[in-house]
């Protein structure tokens, strides 16, 4: 199988500067290569920072590469090489390579303590909603982490001044901590966020747009699971009006909540 051969080639050269762009290129969507309208739409949806190159792969192919790399005996060397590349030059790696690094961390078979340790140097690399959300939504290992341990791990990121570190904490909480016992704690954390202190590099959007949308998404998801509690919280909360409007919009857009009154 071509993809396995490509991954083996990468693993043999892991100690060099070569990363996996060359191995990803054969799996670029033909439509991305051949249809300008499709290519522009793909790039627009991902909305990476201008300096971040996008190759044009779909998520299933990216996940397949990551799973194969995670099975390599030298996978920790692979992750270390990714870390060195990101540290050497922020935008050297493509959007897809950046996501592969996170999905390898997700796919590893290791104790949760070790996984959190591997995750720490990756979180500062997040600078795009698609990388952040694809990582978080595929981090099923988080279900096996004691909830209080996961919550403590997320605390520094809730307090971060960087947009996607905060969004990371929001989406992880949405995916793995929206449980009855944690609902009030998560809701309280939303009110504690000071949006005025969070820096965004997306200067063409209401800053920090992707944190506001993360808050709205979390609340809309909570509405689907705990409608009465969520409505009560939103009504009484000190959340900004724009976050409340985004929440109502997300609720209307979701098939799970489009018939549920958001307030």
PLM regions with names:
Residues 3-263:
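Alpha-helical scaffold domains
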């Amino acid at each position: 199988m071509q993809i396995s051969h490509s991954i083996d080639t990468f693993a043999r050269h892991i100690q060099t500067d070569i990363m996996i762009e060359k191995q990803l290129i054969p799996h670029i969507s033909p439509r991305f290569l051949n249809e300008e309208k499709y290519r522009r739409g793909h790039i627009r949806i991902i909305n990476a920072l201008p300096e971040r190159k996008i190759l044009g792969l779909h998520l299933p192919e990216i996940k397949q590469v990551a799973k194969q790399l995670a099975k390599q005996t030298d996978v920790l060397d692979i992750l270390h090489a990714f870390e060195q590349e990101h540290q050497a030059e922020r935008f050297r790696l493509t959007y897809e390579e950046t996501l592969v690094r996170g999905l390898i961390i997700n796919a590893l078979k290791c104790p949760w303590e070790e996984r959190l340790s591997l995750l720490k140097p990756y979180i500062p690399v997040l600078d795009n909603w698609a990388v952040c959300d694809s990582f978080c939504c595929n981090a099923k290992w988080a279900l096996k982490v004691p909830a209080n341990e996961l919550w403590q791990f997320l605390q520094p990121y809730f307090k971060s001044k960087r947009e996607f570190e905060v969004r990371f904490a929001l989406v992880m909480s949405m995916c793995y901590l929206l449980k009855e016992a944690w609902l009030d704690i998560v809701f309280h954390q939303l009110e504690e966020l000071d949006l005025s202190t969070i820096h965004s590099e997306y200067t063409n959007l209401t800053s920090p747009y992707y944190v506001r949308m993360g808050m709205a998404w979390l609340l809309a998801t909570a509405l689907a699971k705990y409608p009465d509690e969520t409505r009560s919280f939103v009504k009484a909360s000190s959340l900004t009006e724009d976050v409340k409007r985004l929440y109502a919009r997300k609720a209307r857009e979701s098939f799970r909540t489009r018939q549920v009154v958001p307030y």
